[in-house]
């Protein structure tokens, strides 16, 4: 399981009816499409978005310069580049700025629950990133703090049926340890 108890991917949250017809990463560089995304220098979610966009562009013709330019244009289409992953969600869902919010799949579903499925649609692009957030016990830290047993129990719990059901309930993609 490569030390990850669940996975996710980056999807697009768009306004209801998808008025800008956003279907794939290439749509994010259209001049009339405003992209709301976090800064990849300050946000882990922003880094996943950056990597997903870059991977899409690179896979078009294996040209790193073109992939760099593509991602640069995605960010130029951003009227606001927030510092954290939650900021862009607030900017998009509450403040009503932008046409598309690239975000983790679970976050997109949370927006539907919090703000109403009648206001937004989720678009799954044909290609995206396979996000695997890792977990690990750092032995030196756990030993120094006397928390090794608790840390190991927590790690073991993450792969139980109960924890996997919790991940699924919150729109993450569970993964069972073999």
Regions from the language model: what does each represent?
Residues 17-23, 42, 55-63, 141-151:
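Short helix-loop capping/hinge motifs at secondary-structure junctions, enriched
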Residues 11-13, 121, 134-136:
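Residues embedded in well-ordered beta-strands
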Residues 142-178:
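Extracellular/periplasmic juxtamembrane helices and adjacent flexible linkers that interface
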Residues 3-7, 27-30, 44, 93-96, ...:
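Extracellular/periplasmic catalytic domains that process cell-envelope and extracellular macromolecules
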Residues 12, 17-20, 40-45, 106-109, ...:
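Solvent-exposed loop/turn segments at secondary-structure junctions
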Residues 1-42:
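N-terminal segment of the mature folded domain
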Residues 60-126:
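Ligand-binding pocket segment of bilobal, Venus flytrap-like solute-binding proteins
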Residues 14-16, 33-60, 74-78, 123-125:
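Short beta-strand->loop
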């Amino acid at each position: 399981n490569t030390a990850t108890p669940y996975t996710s991917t980056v999807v697009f949250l768009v306004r209801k009816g998808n008025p800008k017809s956003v279907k794939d990463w290439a749509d994010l560089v259209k001049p009339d499409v405003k992209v709301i995304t976090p800064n990849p220098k300050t946000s882990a979610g922003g880094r996943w978005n950056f990597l997903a966009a870059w991977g899409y562009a690179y896979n078009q013709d294996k040209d790193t310069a073109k992939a760099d330019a593509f991602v640069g244009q995605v960010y130029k289409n951003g009227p606001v580049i927030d510092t954290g992953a939650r900021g862009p969600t607030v900017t998009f869902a509450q403040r009503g700025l932008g046409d598309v919010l690239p975000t983790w799949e679970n976050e997109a579903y949370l927006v539907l629950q919090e703000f109403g499925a009648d206001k937004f649609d989720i678009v799954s692009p044909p290609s995206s990133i396979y996000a695997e957030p890792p977990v690990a016990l750092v032995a030196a830290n756990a030993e120094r703090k006397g928390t090794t047993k608790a840390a190991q129990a927590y790690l073991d719990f993450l792969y139980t049926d109960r924890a996997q059901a919790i991940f699924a309930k919150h729109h993450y993609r569970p993964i069972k340890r073999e």
